[in-house]
Amino acid sequence: VANDHSIAWGVAQALAGQGAELAFTYQGEHYARRVRPLAASVGSEIVMPADVQDAGSLDAVFDRLAADWGKMDFLVHAIAYSDKAQLTGRYADTTRENFLHTMDISCYSFTDLARRAGALMRSGGAMVTMTYLGAQRVMPNYNAMGVAKAALEASVRYLANDFGPDGIRVNAISPGPMRTLAGSAIGGARKVYKVCAENAPMRQNATLDDVGGAAVYLLSDLGRGTTGEVVFVDSG
């Protein structure tokens, strides 16, 4: 969770509303002062820093979860990053450094977290990650992030196959354009919001509540027959 406008927070609110017990992670102390009050507002006492590029940091997170809970029922992955300066211009000009960094944080982190969380889902469970239409179509100002999201969607299918025998489902939610911290990094975001709202069948953009509702379905027994899928929540 980054702040109260993040997709992860919308999901957390929806899950808490259904009685889920939650743990929160954040990236660095800069975000801690925003996340701790949010976690407290839904009764969560587990709030930890997590650096997905640091195995030791993730070890600490999952050691704490194992000690406090003993098991997990679900995982929500809502992490992505690419150099903002390289989201514009030609994808062909993306540097090797930025490509690998983008793939590591935006894609591989889900596989790493899924493996760790799966070990704690002893009675089955569910996992959800967040993707975007730029994974399936060329979108302006998305570049390496689109490639990383495409790899993330493929990861969902492979992970669903890996964990299916253990009763663990793995899916992705693909929200439409949203006014989030991550969304603001995309060039021309305001125009995208406006055009999508004008042209979507429902004539509006999806909300955090909409995404949260989809997550509740996928992470609960309501979605017990759904795995390996990308669920669009974008007003059509």
Predicted feature residues:
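Canonical Rossmann dinucleotide-binding motif of NAD(H)/NADP(H)-dependent dehydrogenases/reductases
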Residues: 1-23
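Catalytic loop of short-chain dehydrogenase/reductase
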Residues: 1-7, 80-111, 115, 119, ...
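Conserved glycine-rich Rossmann-like NAD(P)H-binding loop of the short-chain dehydrogenase/reductase
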Residues: 19-36
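Rossmann-fold cofactor-recognition segment
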Residues: 39-56
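Short, small/polar-rich loop/turn modules that mediate ligand/substrate recognition or access, typified
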Residues: 164, 169, 226-228
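Short, flexible catalytic-loop segment of classical short-chain dehydrogenase/reductase
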Residues: 170, 174-185
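A conserved structural motif in NAD(P)-dependent oxidoreductases
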Residues: 200-211, 222
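Short-chain dehydrogenase/reductase
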Residues: 224-236
